[in-house]
Amino acid sequence: FVLVDTGAGIAAKSVDFVAAAAEALLIVTPEPTAIADAYATLKVLRQRGGDLALGLLVNMADSAAEATDLHEKFQEMALRFLGAEIDNRGYIPLDRYVREAVKRQIPFVLASPPTPAAEGIGEVAGALLERESISELGRTGLFARALQQRNWSKRAD
């Protein structure tokens, strides 16, 4: 797995990098601006990412119901306007211990385990690792696809 945190929006070079992966995981908070940024990123990835598999992870959700509702609405919008299927990859709950750990400059998964957010990350990571397609990613993963997409015979001097 390679994690690319693009913040709001996505740069052209980041799109090429992400498009070389077998799957992109969009992480979104349940805030209008974050949802708009995730949709804009999705639109760019659909235009340049080819057959890239897509998933949505909701961060800082008040509840599982809020995360599910956000995924369903995002999926409906993505399917209607972009023809994109977005898998639900779970959620990480809003957790006051995260803010406290940031103030103390300590990773929250180490500062106060088991916090709700740390447990959420563990569940998401476990689900990603258990997926059957992981064994196949080695054949078509990031670096294999990057080599296919780039013309490495021409070098910039």
Label every PLM stretch briefly.
Residues V2, A24-L25:
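Short, well-ordered beta-strand core segments
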